[in-house]
Amino acid sequence: GYPSQAQGMGGRQVRNGKDHGEIFDHHFVEFTYDSGAVIASQCRHQPGCMRRVDETLQGSQGCVNTKTGKLTDLEGNEIYKYKSDMLNEPNPYQVEHDKLFASIRNGGVIADAENGAKSTLTAIMGRMATYSGKVITWDQAMNSDMQIMPESLDWDSNPPTMPNSNGSYTIPTPGVTEF
């Protein structure tokens, strides 16, 4: 399933010049599911810092980190670690493409549009939460009139956010920015 709500924080500390548009350079989002499960997602785009883009699933008996492939108990003891054999395992991106191309050749259908759209909305909901500083529900994100796409998709289209006369962009401010 998909999260029922998101809350988070983020900001611009390093990438704050006119050449960086409106984007934050770090985000931390907690996605909460109807079951009560919470997934913590974080990213940072700051030169000279540890770069981290991953998700952590915290349960009542332990924790899973998607980047390390480790499952630990509540005391941090390793219960399981995915053992990768990088030399003999196929590249997952290549496997995905192989399946897609085989499906096309054989007249099959891989119907991932709904999953792709809902996964994208999940990411947008997280960004809405960090930019606004508010808890954003799935329904609020789904029904929002926020426009992040150009009005038309052609080579002459402008993005929905343009710089002002000084070349600066309006930067989202948590607690002020609406979604």
Q: Where on the chain are the PLM-derived regions?
A:
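Contiguous beta-strand/loop segments that form the cofactor/metal-binding neighborhood of enzyme cores
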Residues: G1-F179
